[in-house]
Amino acid sequence: CRALLDAIEDGNRADGINIIALFDHEEIGSNSKQGAASIMLHDMLRRILRNMDLSENEIDESIYDAMLLSVDVAHALHPNKKEKMDITNKPVMGKGFCIKQACSQSYATDAQAIAILCQLCDEKGIPYQRFVNRSDSRGGSTLGSIAGTLLPVKTVDIGIPILAMHSA
């Protein structure tokens, strides 16, 4: 959270709105008034834009032009479970964050958002990796795909690769 706040404080934007959205109840489905499946983020964004004296059409255009960076963790290549990974996308720890994708849309990552993020990382020399769920495995999901059902914005799910994500 500190890094997110520092980024907004240190950001040098002449226009636009930066929002950090932290949701509750992620591990139990996000179906609460303060979870990612609520209309809270959508309504809050519309209220902010309405208070900027934008028309409804301008509000819609602003939302469609927005981008959501959904930040979580990612499964790193586990030395004891190599068969669980897609053979062409094996993220490892310490080599940059992962851009996460799944054909099931359990990650909300879309092509336009990937292009924007990859270009930015390439320009700034920020290392990144790709993680694609195997198509024969359900895999996880993120708040990006949940929030995206109510907020139609360009989205990319990213995460820092770790081992043993759900072990105690």
Annotate the PLM regions.
Residues 1, 6, 69, 136-144:
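Conserved alpha/beta core surface patches that mediate binding of polyanionic ligands
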Residues 5-12, 46, 50-54, 118-127, ...:
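Generic secondary-structure signature for well-ordered alpha-helical cores
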Residues 74-167:
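Active-site-adjacent substrate-binding region
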Residues 11-20, 53-65, 121-135:
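Flexible, glycine/charged-enriched surface loops at secondary-structure junctions
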Residues 20, 68-70, 155-157:
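Short glycine-aspartate micro-motif
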Residues 33-96, 100:
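A glycine- and small/hydrophobic-rich beta-loop-beta segment
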Residues 23-34, 135-144:
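Beta-rich nucleic-acid/ligand-interaction surfaces
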Residues 1-29:
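Alpha-helical metal-binding/catalytic segments enriched in His/Glu/Asp
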